[in-house]
Protein backbone atom coordinates (compact mmCIF):
# COMPACT_ATOMS: atom_id res chain seq x y z
CA UNK A 1 0.00 0.00 0.00
CA UNK A 2 1.38 3.40 -0.99
CA UNK A 3 1.54 5.95 1.82
CA UNK A 4 0.47 9.29 0.40
CA UNK A 5 2.23 12.54 1.30
CA UNK A 6 0.97 16.10 0.99
CA UNK A 7 3.38 16.57 -1.92
CA UNK A 8 1.43 13.92 -3.85
CA UNK A 9 -1.57 16.24 -4.00
CA UNK A 10 -2.13 19.51 -5.84
CA UNK A 11 -2.07 22.75 -3.88
CA UNK A 12 -5.46 23.20 -2.17
CA UNK A 13 -7.45 26.39 -2.78
CA UNK A 14 -7.27 29.02 -0.06
CA UNK A 15 -10.27 31.20 0.71
CA UNK A 16 -9.70 34.94 0.67
CA UNK A 17 -9.83 36.68 4.05
CA UNK A 18 -12.46 39.44 4.03
CA UNK A 19 -13.16 40.47 7.65
CA UNK A 20 -16.75 41.15 8.76
CA UNK A 21 -17.33 42.61 12.21
CA UNK A 22 -20.39 41.71 14.31
CA UNK A 23 -21.41 43.05 17.70
CA UNK A 24 -23.25 40.64 20.00
CA UNK A 25 -23.83 40.92 23.74
CA UNK A 26 -21.60 43.99 23.91
CA UNK A 27 -18.63 42.24 22.30
CA UNK A 28 -17.19 42.49 18.82
CA UNK A 29 -16.55 39.36 16.77
CA UNK A 30 -14.66 39.17 13.50
CA UNK A 31 -15.61 36.56 10.91
CA UNK A 32 -13.04 36.40 8.12
CA UNK A 33 -15.17 34.09 6.00
CA UNK A 34 -18.72 35.44 6.39
CA UNK A 35 -18.60 36.42 2.72
CA UNK A 36 -18.77 32.74 1.79
CA UNK A 37 -22.43 32.67 2.88
CA UNK A 38 -23.41 34.80 -0.13
CA UNK A 39 -24.13 32.24 -2.85
CA UNK A 40 -25.00 34.98 -5.32
CA UNK A 41 -21.38 36.20 -5.20
CA UNK A 42 -19.46 34.87 -8.26
CA UNK A 43 -16.30 34.65 -6.13
CA UNK A 44 -18.08 32.22 -3.78
CA UNK A 45 -19.14 29.99 -6.67
CA UNK A 46 -15.62 30.14 -8.11
CA UNK A 47 -14.15 29.10 -4.76
CA UNK A 48 -16.63 26.23 -4.34
CA UNK A 49 -15.77 24.93 -7.81
CA UNK A 50 -12.08 25.05 -6.92
CA UNK A 51 -12.76 23.08 -3.71
CA UNK A 52 -14.74 20.48 -5.65
CA UNK A 53 -12.02 20.17 -8.28
CA UNK A 54 -9.41 19.69 -5.56
CA UNK A 55 -11.52 17.00 -3.88
CA UNK A 56 -12.00 15.18 -7.20
CA UNK A 57 -8.26 15.24 -7.79
CA UNK A 58 -7.33 13.97 -4.33
CA UNK A 59 -9.92 11.18 -4.35
CA UNK A 60 -9.46 10.14 -7.99
CA UNK A 61 -7.89 6.81 -7.01
CA UNK A 62 -10.99 5.86 -4.99
CA UNK A 63 -13.57 6.33 -7.78
CA UNK A 64 -14.27 2.60 -8.10
CA UNK A 65 -14.64 2.18 -4.34
CA UNK A 66 -16.93 5.21 -4.19
CA UNK A 67 -19.22 3.54 -6.72
CA UNK A 68 -19.24 0.27 -4.75
CA UNK A 69 -20.20 2.11 -1.55
CA UNK A 70 -22.82 4.17 -3.40
CA UNK A 71 -24.40 1.07 -4.93
CA UNK A 72 -24.54 -0.63 -1.52
CA UNK A 73 -26.22 2.39 0.08
CA UNK A 74 -28.75 2.69 -2.77
CA UNK A 75 -29.42 -1.04 -2.48
CA UNK A 76 -30.70 -0.44 1.04
CA UNK A 77 -33.07 2.30 -0.08
CA UNK A 78 -36.43 1.85 -1.72
CA UNK A 79 -36.35 4.47 -4.46
CA UNK A 80 -40.00 4.14 -5.48
CA UNK A 81 -41.89 4.52 -2.23
CA UNK A 82 -45.01 6.15 -0.84
CA UNK A 83 -45.72 7.48 2.63
CA UNK A 84 -48.70 6.19 4.60
CA UNK A 85 -51.59 8.67 4.15
CA UNK A 86 -52.50 11.08 6.92
CA UNK A 87 -56.09 12.34 7.26
CA UNK A 88 -56.74 16.02 7.91
CA UNK A 89 -59.83 18.18 7.31
CA UNK A 90 -61.45 15.76 4.89
CA UNK A 91 -58.37 14.87 2.84
CA UNK A 92 -55.80 12.09 2.85
CA UNK A 93 -52.32 13.53 2.39
CA UNK A 94 -49.27 11.55 1.30
CA UNK A 95 -46.07 11.84 -0.70
CA UNK A 96 -44.06 9.52 -2.91
CA UNK A 97 -40.65 9.07 -4.46
CA UNK A 98 -39.96 7.57 -7.88
CA UNK A 99 -36.91 5.68 -9.09
CA UNK A 100 -34.40 7.94 -10.78
CA UNK A 101 -35.99 11.12 -9.46
CA UNK A 102 -34.42 13.26 -6.77
CA UNK A 103 -37.45 14.88 -5.15
CA UNK A 104 -40.81 13.92 -3.68
CA UNK A 105 -44.25 14.45 -5.14
CA UNK A 106 -46.89 15.64 -2.64
CA UNK A 107 -50.49 14.52 -3.18
CA UNK A 108 -53.92 14.28 -1.59
CA UNK A 109 -57.27 12.55 -2.14
CA UNK A 110 -60.61 13.84 -0.92
CA UNK A 111 -62.62 11.63 1.43
CA UNK A 112 -60.97 8.30 0.67
CA UNK A 113 -57.88 6.81 -0.93
CA UNK A 114 -60.11 5.63 -3.79
CA UNK A 115 -60.87 9.24 -4.79
CA UNK A 116 -58.99 10.87 -7.71
CA UNK A 117 -55.45 11.93 -6.88
CA UNK A 118 -54.64 15.63 -6.64
CA UNK A 119 -50.96 16.50 -7.08
CA UNK A 120 -50.24 19.43 -4.80
CA UNK A 121 -46.52 19.81 -5.55
CA UNK A 122 -44.41 17.93 -8.07
CA UNK A 123 -41.05 19.01 -6.71
CA UNK A 124 -39.16 17.27 -9.53
CA UNK A 125 -40.91 19.55 -12.03
CA UNK A 126 -40.31 22.59 -9.81
CA UNK A 127 -36.58 21.81 -9.61
CA UNK A 128 -36.10 21.00 -13.30
CA UNK A 129 -33.28 22.97 -14.89
CA UNK A 130 -32.17 24.55 -11.62
CA UNK A 131 -28.64 23.96 -10.26
CA UNK A 132 -29.96 23.73 -6.70
CA UNK A 133 -33.43 23.39 -5.21
CA UNK A 134 -34.74 22.80 -1.70
CA UNK A 135 -38.45 22.36 -0.96
CA UNK A 136 -39.10 23.14 2.70
CA UNK A 137 -42.77 22.21 3.00
CA UNK A 138 -46.25 23.68 2.78
CA UNK A 139 -49.34 24.59 4.81
CA UNK A 140 -52.91 24.20 3.58
CA UNK A 141 -55.45 26.99 4.14
CA UNK A 142 -58.45 26.25 6.41
CA UNK A 143 -60.77 26.01 3.37
CA UNK A 144 -58.42 23.45 1.74
CA UNK A 145 -58.24 25.63 -1.40
CA UNK A 146 -54.78 27.18 -1.12
CA UNK A 147 -51.28 26.26 0.04
CA UNK A 148 -48.47 28.47 1.23
CA UNK A 149 -45.14 26.84 0.40
CA UNK A 150 -41.43 27.44 0.91
CA UNK A 151 -38.40 26.78 -1.30
CA UNK A 152 -35.07 28.15 -2.41
CA UNK A 153 -32.87 27.81 -5.47
CA UNK A 154 -29.52 28.51 -3.79
CA UNK A 155 -29.08 25.31 -1.77
CA UNK A 156 -29.17 27.22 1.52
CA UNK A 157 -31.28 25.82 4.35
CA UNK A 158 -31.32 29.24 6.05
CA UNK A 159 -33.22 31.35 3.51
CA UNK A 160 -36.51 30.45 1.84
CA UNK A 161 -38.92 32.13 -0.55
CA UNK A 162 -42.63 31.90 0.28
CA UNK A 163 -45.36 31.67 -2.35
CA UNK A 164 -49.09 30.89 -2.32
CA UNK A 165 -50.66 28.37 -4.68
CA UNK A 166 -54.30 28.05 -5.72
CA UNK A 167 -54.87 24.30 -5.62
CA UNK A 168 -57.73 24.27 -8.14
CA UNK A 169 -55.86 26.08 -10.93
CA UNK A 170 -52.33 25.14 -9.90
CA UNK A 171 -51.31 28.79 -10.29
CA UNK A 172 -49.48 30.98 -7.80
CA UNK A 173 -51.65 33.77 -6.40
CA UNK A 174 -51.29 36.72 -4.07
CA UNK A 175 -47.85 37.85 -2.98
CA UNK A 176 -44.46 36.20 -2.60
CA UNK A 177 -41.79 36.94 -0.01
CA UNK A 178 -38.08 36.23 0.46
CA UNK A 179 -36.46 35.23 3.75
CA UNK A 180 -39.52 33.62 5.35
CA UNK A 181 -38.89 31.33 8.33
CA UNK A 182 -42.48 30.44 9.36
CA UNK A 183 -46.09 31.14 8.40
CA UNK A 184 -49.66 30.57 9.62
CA UNK A 185 -53.11 31.01 8.07
CA UNK A 186 -55.92 32.93 9.71
CA UNK A 187 -59.37 31.36 9.47
CA UNK A 188 -60.56 33.90 6.89
CA UNK A 189 -58.40 32.05 4.32
CA UNK A 190 -56.93 35.30 3.02
CA UNK A 191 -54.71 36.54 5.86
CA UNK A 192 -51.22 35.17 6.39
CA UNK A 193 -48.87 35.74 9.28
CA UNK A 194 -45.19 35.15 8.56
CA UNK A 195 -41.77 35.73 10.08
CA UNK A 196 -38.75 37.15 8.27
CA UNK A 197 -35.05 36.64 8.94
CA UNK A 198 -32.57 39.50 9.38
CA UNK A 199 -29.04 39.79 7.98
CA UNK A 200 -27.74 37.39 10.65
CA UNK A 201 -30.39 34.84 9.53
CA UNK A 202 -32.32 35.28 12.81
CA UNK A 203 -36.10 35.04 12.46
CA UNK A 204 -37.11 38.23 14.25
CA UNK A 205 -39.96 40.13 12.56
CA UNK A 206 -43.61 39.01 12.30
CA UNK A 207 -45.85 40.41 9.56
CA UNK A 208 -49.55 40.19 8.71
CA UNK A 209 -50.67 40.42 5.09
CA UNK A 210 -53.79 39.64 3.07
CA UNK A 211 -53.40 37.96 -0.31
CA UNK A 212 -54.35 41.11 -2.25
CA UNK A 213 -52.32 43.57 -0.16
CA UNK A 214 -49.23 45.20 -1.75
CA UNK A 215 -47.21 44.92 1.46
CA UNK A 216 -47.30 43.30 4.87
CA UNK A 217 -47.79 45.07 8.19
CA UNK A 218 -45.14 44.62 10.87
CA UNK A 219 -46.96 43.48 14.00
CA UNK A 220 -44.08 42.27 16.18
CA UNK A 221 -40.32 42.84 16.24
CA UNK A 222 -38.03 40.80 18.49
CA UNK A 223 -35.32 43.30 19.46
CA UNK A 224 -33.36 41.08 21.85
CA UNK A 225 -30.70 39.42 19.67
CA UNK A 226 -30.65 36.40 21.98
CA UNK A 227 -34.19 35.53 20.88
CA UNK A 228 -35.74 34.32 17.63
CA UNK A 229 -39.44 34.76 16.85
CA UNK A 230 -41.73 32.43 14.89
CA UNK A 231 -45.44 32.22 14.11
CA UNK A 232 -47.68 29.12 14.16
CA UNK A 233 -51.30 28.03 14.26
CA UNK A 234 -52.85 25.78 16.90
CA UNK A 235 -54.06 22.24 16.26
CA UNK A 236 -57.55 23.27 17.38
CA UNK A 237 -57.62 25.95 14.62
CA UNK A 238 -58.53 28.49 17.33
CA UNK A 239 -55.35 30.53 17.73
CA UNK A 240 -52.33 32.08 16.09
CA UNK A 241 -49.18 32.12 18.26
CA UNK A 242 -45.98 34.14 18.14
CA UNK A 243 -43.19 32.37 20.02
CA UNK A 244 -40.02 34.19 21.08
CA UNK A 245 -37.30 31.91 22.39
CA UNK A 246 -33.66 31.87 23.39
CA UNK A 247 -31.69 28.86 24.61
CA UNK A 248 -33.09 29.22 28.16
CA UNK A 249 -36.12 31.54 28.01
CA UNK A 250 -39.35 31.78 26.02
CA UNK A 251 -42.48 33.89 25.70
CA UNK A 252 -45.70 33.44 23.71
CA UNK A 253 -48.30 35.82 22.31
CA UNK A 254 -51.60 34.85 20.74
CA UNK A 255 -54.81 35.98 19.07
CA UNK A 256 -57.97 34.27 17.88
CA UNK A 257 -57.49 32.83 14.39
CA UNK A 258 -61.01 34.14 13.65
CA UNK A 259 -59.93 37.75 14.35
CA UNK A 260 -56.64 38.29 12.51
CA UNK A 261 -56.59 42.07 12.99
CA UNK A 262 -56.65 41.83 16.80
CA UNK A 263 -53.63 42.87 18.83
CA UNK A 264 -51.53 39.93 20.07
CA UNK A 265 -51.72 39.28 23.81
CA UNK A 266 -48.77 38.07 25.87
CA UNK A 267 -49.68 34.71 27.39
CA UNK A 268 -47.16 34.84 30.27
CA UNK A 269 -44.58 37.64 30.50
CA UNK A 270 -40.96 36.78 29.77
CA UNK A 271 -38.94 35.70 32.81
CA UNK A 272 -35.25 34.87 32.56
CA UNK A 273 -34.57 31.09 32.61
CA UNK A 274 -38.27 30.20 32.33
CA UNK A 275 -39.36 28.28 29.23
CA UNK A 276 -42.97 27.47 28.45
CA UNK A 277 -45.05 26.24 25.52
CA UNK A 278 -48.83 26.54 25.18
CA UNK A 279 -50.89 23.61 23.84
CA UNK A 280 -54.54 24.64 23.39
CA UNK A 281 -57.45 22.31 24.08
CA UNK A 282 -60.88 23.64 23.13
CA UNK A 283 -61.81 23.85 26.81
CA UNK A 284 -58.49 24.75 28.45
CA UNK A 285 -54.80 25.40 27.92
CA UNK A 286 -52.07 22.88 28.65
CA UNK A 287 -48.70 24.50 29.34
CA UNK A 288 -45.34 22.76 29.45
CA UNK A 289 -43.30 24.75 31.96
CA UNK A 290 -39.61 24.65 32.85
CA UNK A 291 -37.49 26.72 35.23
CA UNK A 292 -34.34 26.29 37.31
CA UNK A 293 -36.21 24.34 40.00
CA UNK A 294 -37.98 22.13 37.44
CA UNK A 295 -35.35 21.40 34.81
CA UNK A 296 -37.13 18.31 33.47
CA UNK A 297 -40.35 20.26 33.04
CA UNK A 298 -43.90 19.89 34.30
CA UNK A 299 -47.35 20.42 32.78
CA UNK A 300 -50.06 22.74 34.03
CA UNK A 301 -53.65 22.97 32.88
CA UNK A 302 -55.13 26.47 32.84
CA UNK A 303 -58.54 27.98 32.04
CA UNK A 304 -59.01 29.79 28.72
CA UNK A 305 -59.60 33.02 30.65
CA UNK A 306 -58.25 34.11 34.00
CA UNK A 307 -55.08 32.06 33.73
CA UNK A 308 -53.03 35.17 34.58
CA UNK A 309 -53.87 34.39 38.21
CA UNK A 310 -51.43 31.66 39.18
CA UNK A 311 -53.99 30.30 41.62
CA UNK A 312 -55.93 29.09 38.56
CA UNK A 313 -53.08 26.80 37.48
CA UNK A 314 -53.63 23.10 38.16
CA UNK A 315 -50.76 20.59 38.02
CA UNK A 316 -51.48 18.05 35.27
CA UNK A 317 -48.13 16.29 35.37
CA UNK A 318 -45.74 17.13 38.23
CA UNK A 319 -42.01 17.53 37.90
CA UNK A 320 -39.96 14.33 38.15
CA UNK A 321 -36.20 14.56 38.57
CA UNK A 322 -35.82 11.23 36.76
CA UNK A 323 -38.16 11.89 33.82
CA UNK A 324 -37.85 14.70 31.27
CA UNK A 325 -40.86 15.91 29.29
CA UNK A 326 -39.81 16.11 25.64
CA UNK A 327 -43.08 16.46 23.75
CA UNK A 328 -46.83 16.93 24.06
CA UNK A 329 -49.72 16.45 21.66
CA UNK A 330 -53.34 17.26 22.46
CA UNK A 331 -56.41 15.31 21.37
CA UNK A 332 -60.00 16.04 22.35
CA UNK A 333 -60.03 13.41 25.10
CA UNK A 334 -56.34 12.62 25.67
CA UNK A 335 -52.92 14.15 26.15
CA UNK A 336 -50.06 12.33 24.42
CA UNK A 337 -46.67 12.57 26.09
CA UNK A 338 -43.12 11.94 24.92
CA UNK A 339 -40.95 11.38 28.00
CA UNK A 340 -37.25 10.63 28.45
CA UNK A 341 -36.58 8.06 31.18
CA UNK A 342 -33.35 6.11 31.73
CA UNK A 343 -32.10 7.48 28.42
CA UNK A 344 -35.07 6.08 26.45
CA UNK A 345 -38.28 7.59 25.12
CA UNK A 346 -41.59 6.62 26.74
CA UNK A 347 -44.88 7.40 25.03
CA UNK A 348 -47.77 7.83 27.45
CA UNK A 349 -51.49 8.47 27.02
CA UNK A 350 -53.24 10.44 29.73
CA UNK A 351 -56.94 11.42 29.84
CA UNK A 352 -57.54 15.16 29.41
CA UNK A 353 -59.43 15.16 32.72
CA UNK A 354 -56.29 14.01 34.53
CA UNK A 355 -58.30 11.21 36.12
CA UNK A 356 -58.18 7.58 35.11
CA UNK A 357 -55.41 5.29 33.99
CA UNK A 358 -52.23 6.52 32.30
CA UNK A 359 -51.15 4.11 29.55
CA UNK A 360 -47.55 3.51 28.51
CA UNK A 361 -46.84 2.08 25.06
CA UNK A 362 -44.80 -1.15 25.21
CA UNK A 363 -41.88 -1.66 22.83
CA UNK A 364 -40.27 -4.99 21.80
CA UNK A 365 -36.56 -4.14 22.19
CA UNK A 366 -34.68 -2.95 25.29
CA UNK A 367 -32.99 -0.15 23.30
CA UNK A 368 -34.86 1.87 20.67
CA UNK A 369 -35.97 5.27 19.42
CA UNK A 370 -39.66 6.22 19.32
CA UNK A 371 -41.59 9.40 18.66
CA UNK A 372 -45.11 10.68 18.07
CA UNK A 373 -45.67 10.87 14.33
CA UNK A 374 -48.26 12.77 12.32
CA UNK A 375 -51.43 13.25 14.38
CA UNK A 376 -53.16 16.30 12.87
CA UNK A 377 -56.77 15.46 13.82
CA UNK A 378 -57.91 16.95 17.14
CA UNK A 379 -60.95 14.62 17.41
CA UNK A 380 -58.97 11.43 16.75
CA UNK A 381 -59.48 8.32 18.90
CA UNK A 382 -56.17 6.83 17.75
CA UNK A 383 -52.67 8.17 17.32
CA UNK A 384 -49.54 7.29 15.39
CA UNK A 385 -45.99 6.82 16.50
CA UNK A 386 -42.76 5.74 14.81
CA UNK A 387 -40.35 3.16 16.18
CA UNK A 388 -36.88 1.96 15.23
CA UNK A 389 -34.12 0.00 16.94
CA UNK A 390 -30.69 -1.44 16.22
CA UNK A 391 -32.30 -4.47 14.55
CA UNK A 392 -35.54 -2.99 13.24
CA UNK A 393 -36.13 -0.45 10.42
CA UNK A 394 -38.27 2.61 11.08
CA UNK A 395 -41.89 1.49 11.42
CA UNK A 396 -45.09 3.53 11.68
CA UNK A 397 -47.74 2.24 14.11
CA UNK A 398 -51.24 3.34 15.05
CA UNK A 399 -52.56 2.83 18.57
CA UNK A 400 -56.33 2.84 19.16
CA UNK A 401 -56.85 4.31 22.62
CA UNK A 402 -60.33 2.86 23.04
CA UNK A 403 -59.63 -0.73 21.96
CA UNK A 404 -55.95 -0.66 23.05
CA UNK A 405 -55.00 -2.29 19.76
CA UNK A 406 -51.75 -1.53 17.94
CA UNK A 407 -51.66 -1.73 14.14
CA UNK A 408 -48.52 -1.69 11.99
CA UNK A 409 -49.11 0.77 9.16
CA UNK A 410 -45.80 0.84 7.31
CA UNK A 411 -42.30 -0.56 7.78
CA UNK A 412 -39.30 0.81 5.96
CA UNK A 413 -38.47 -1.68 3.22
CA UNK A 414 -34.85 -2.71 2.67
CA UNK A 415 -34.67 -3.86 -1.00
CA UNK A 416 -31.38 -5.71 -0.52
CA UNK A 417 -33.02 -7.82 2.18
CA UNK A 418 -33.02 -7.73 5.97
CA UNK A 419 -34.61 -9.82 8.71
CA UNK A 420 -34.79 -8.17 12.16
CA UNK A 421 -35.26 -11.61 13.73
CA UNK A 422 -31.69 -12.54 12.77
CA UNK A 423 -30.30 -10.16 15.38
CA UNK A 424 -30.51 -9.71 19.14
CA UNK A 425 -30.44 -6.36 20.93
CA UNK A 426 -29.33 -6.03 24.55
CA UNK A 427 -28.84 -3.20 26.98
CA UNK A 428 -26.07 -3.45 29.55
CA UNK A 429 -24.97 -1.09 32.28
CA UNK A 430 -21.34 -0.21 32.96
CA UNK A 431 -20.21 1.40 36.21
CA UNK A 432 -18.09 4.51 35.68
CA UNK A 433 -15.23 5.37 38.09
CA UNK A 434 -17.51 7.81 39.93
CA UNK A 435 -20.16 5.11 40.40
CA UNK A 436 -22.56 6.41 37.73
CA UNK A 437 -24.33 3.70 35.73
CA UNK A 438 -23.71 4.18 31.98
CA UNK A 439 -26.04 2.38 29.52
CA UNK A 440 -24.56 0.43 26.60
CA UNK A 441 -26.52 -0.88 23.62
CA UNK A 442 -25.30 -4.08 21.95
CA UNK A 443 -26.55 -5.75 18.78
CA UNK A 444 -25.27 -9.07 17.46
CA UNK A 445 -26.32 -11.84 15.11
CA UNK A 446 -28.11 -14.78 16.68
CA UNK A 447 -25.83 -17.68 17.54
CA UNK A 448 -22.95 -15.51 18.73
CA UNK A 449 -20.73 -17.37 21.20
CA UNK A 450 -20.10 -15.07 24.13
CA UNK A 451 -16.55 -16.21 24.80
CA UNK A 452 -14.86 -12.81 24.94
CA UNK A 453 -13.22 -13.25 21.56
CA UNK A 454 -15.64 -11.31 19.37
CA UNK A 455 -14.49 -8.00 17.86
CA UNK A 456 -16.70 -4.98 18.53
CA UNK A 457 -17.23 -1.78 16.59
How would you label these PLM feature ranges?
Residues 1-59, 63, 67-81:
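N-terminal pre-domain segments of enzymes
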Residues 46-139, 228-280, 288, 314-315, ...:
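Non-catalytic accessory segments flanking enzyme active sites
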Residues 107-110, 163-168, 206-212, 253-258, ...:
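Beta-propeller blade signature
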Residues 118-184, 188-189, 332, 337:
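A conserved hydrophobic secondary-structure block that centers on an alpha-helix together
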Residues 166-178, 212-223, 258-268, 307-318, ...:
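Blade-edge beta-strand/turn elements of extracellular beta-propeller
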Residues 187-256:
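Solenoidal tandem-repeat scaffolds enriched in leucines and small polar residues
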Residues 301, 308-330:
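Generic long, charged, amphipathic alpha-helical segments
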Residues 455-457:
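Hydrophobic beta-strand anchors of alpha/beta hydrolase catalytic cores
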Amino acid sequence: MKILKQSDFPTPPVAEIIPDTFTNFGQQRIDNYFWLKDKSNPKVIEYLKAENAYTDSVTASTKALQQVIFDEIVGRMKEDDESYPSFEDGYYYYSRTEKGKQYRTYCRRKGSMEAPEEVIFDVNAMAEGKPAFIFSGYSISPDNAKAVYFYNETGSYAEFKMKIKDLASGEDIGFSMDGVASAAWANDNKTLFYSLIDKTLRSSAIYRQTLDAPAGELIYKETDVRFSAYVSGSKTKQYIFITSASSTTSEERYISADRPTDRFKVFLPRVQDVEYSVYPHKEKFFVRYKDKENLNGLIYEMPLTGYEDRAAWKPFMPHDKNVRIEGIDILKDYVLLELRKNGLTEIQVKPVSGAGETETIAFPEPVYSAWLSGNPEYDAAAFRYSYTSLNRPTTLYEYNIGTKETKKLKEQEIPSGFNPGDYTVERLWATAPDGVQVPMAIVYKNGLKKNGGNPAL
